UniProtKB/Swiss-Prot annotation:
<dbReference type="GO" id="GO:0140537">
    <property type="term" value="F:transcription regulator activator activity"/>
</dbReference>
<feature type="compositionally biased region" description="Low complexity">
    <location>
        <begin position="143"/>
        <end position="155"/>
    </location>
</feature>
<keyword id="KW-0805">Transcription regulation</keyword>
<feature type="compositionally biased region" description="Polar residues">
    <location>
        <begin position="111"/>
        <end position="134"/>
    </location>
</feature>
<keyword id="KW-0539">Nucleus</keyword>
<dbReference type="GO" id="GO:0008047">
    <property type="term" value="F:enzyme activator activity"/>
</dbReference>
<keyword id="KW-0804">Transcription</keyword>
<feature type="region of interest" description="Leucine-zipper">
    <location>
        <begin position="45"/>
        <end position="52"/>
    </location>
</feature>
<dbReference type="InterPro" id="IPR052635">
    <property type="entry name" value="Sec_Metab_Biosynth_Reg"/>
</dbReference>
<feature type="region of interest" description="Disordered">
    <location>
        <begin position="106"/>
        <end position="170"/>
    </location>
</feature>
<comment type="similarity">
    <text>Belongs to the bZIP family.</text>
</comment>
<protein>
    <recommendedName>
        <fullName>Transcription factor ZEB2</fullName>
    </recommendedName>
</protein>
<dbReference type="InterPro" id="IPR004827">
    <property type="entry name" value="bZIP"/>
</dbReference>
<feature type="compositionally biased region" description="Basic and acidic residues">
    <location>
        <begin position="14"/>
        <end position="24"/>
    </location>
</feature>
<dbReference type="InterPro" id="IPR046347">
    <property type="entry name" value="bZIP_sf"/>
</dbReference>
<feature type="domain" description="bZIP">
    <location>
        <begin position="17"/>
        <end position="50"/>
    </location>
</feature>
<feature type="compositionally biased region" description="Polar residues">
    <location>
        <begin position="160"/>
        <end position="170"/>
    </location>
</feature>
Length: 332
């Protein structure tokens, strides 16, 4: 164990500017607090078990009842010991996942009072309790068999029994999904979506992109990222993939994309006409609009405007020709 002098010689977070060193110091502080918390927890459990054991010895004189009470206390203490060990492993895993690598050292070094927790306050284990532990496939020094037995215990005191097996089952299901072929994976996802109350994948995606979620929720933050960053790539992949679809499959998609483009184009022209052009729009205003759109959109708009300009000139020529023919048919 580290001496008091060497501990006080360690620098504090305020004395270090390197982020890695600051994380190491923060890790050491978290380890110290966790060890203190676990030590207090162990002392409370040992005191509680001692009191219960003494009370049972004073009030019960029958040998059979004493053995059953002692077996219950041993099993209770053993279960609480494993629950505390699970808490310790959960905290270590969470700190290690956050980049605090020094937590891994705690797994290698023995923690205080680890052996004492296997017995009740130093009392010799009864044959009943020893055989019970052996039936469970556990021993004092066998950590591998103990870790296998953790699946039958709850993670924290007061939690529902079987929460850890549920987590392991979820991990296995996720691994199975990753190993599936695309057809089976999509079938599983579609079934989950339908079980959640959605008619199909399209209704699910529509609600994801259109629905107004609570601004403080996690799904709202993910939705904003999808709208602002990932939707463009999604539409691009959809446009490229639609080229290989049949005409029947691509018809509705192309029609809706055309409507969207027309709506966006009309809105932009309306905004431009109200802010730049006056009521008497002329060819100069049209030329100005042409230059703006050419610089912002590109050659597609240029070709479109040329076509519109030629159509307008043709209509003007037809109107002029009609008027000349009306007033002087002989010249025509």
């Amino acid at each position: 164990m580290q001496s008091t002098e060497s501990f006080h010689a360690l620098p504090t977070r305020s004395d270090v500017e390197d982020p890695n060193e600051r994380r190491k110091i923060q890790n050491r502080i978290a380890q110290k607090k966790h060890r203190q918390k676990m030590k207090r927890r162990i002392e409370e459990l040992e005191t509680k078990v001692n009191n219960q054991c003494q009370t049972s010895n004073w009030t019960s004189h029958a040998p059979t009842d004493s053995c059953q009470e002692q077996q219950f206390l041993d099993n209770t203490d053993f279960g609480l010991m494993l629950e505390d060990d699970l808490l310790y492993r959960e905290l270590s895993a969470s700190l290690d996942g956050a980049g605090l690598t020094a937590v891994a050292q705690m797994h290698d070094s023995p923690r205080p009072n680890q052996q004492q927790r296997l017995s009740v306050s130093g009392m010799p284990s009864s044959p009943t309790s020893t055989s019970n532990v052996a039936q469970r496939g556990l021993s004092i020094g066998d950590h591998s068999s103990a870790s296998n037995h953790l699946s039958s215990l709850s993670l924290v005191p007061g939690s529902t029994e079987g929460s850890l097996p549920t987590r392991q089952h979820d991990n296995l299901c996720n691994q199975d999904l990753r190993d599936m072929v695309p057809e089976e994976k999509m079938s599983r996802i579609l079934k989950v979506i339908q079980d959640a109350g959605y008619k199909d994948m399209d209704s699910f995606m529509t609600e994801y992109y259109v629905r107004d979620f609570d601004a403080s929720s996690h799904v709202s933050a993910v939705q904003r990222q999808s709208r602002s960053r990932r939707l463009r790539g999604f539409l691009e992949q959809l446009r490229v993939g639609a080229e290989s679809w049949s005409d029947y499959e691509a018809h509705d998609y192309q029609q809706e994309i055309s409507k969207s483009a027309e709506a966006i184009y009309a809105k932009e022209l309306d905004v431009f006409s109200t802010t730049t052009l006056g009521e008497n729009a002329s060819f100069q205003g049209l030329a100005s609009l042409y230059r703006v759109l050419q610089s912002t959109v590109g050659s597609d708009i240029e070709n479109h405007l040329r076509h519109e300009q030629s159509m307008m000139q043709r209509q003007v020529s037809e109107i002029v020709h009609r008027q000349v023919y009306t007033f002087n048919p002989a010249q025509c």
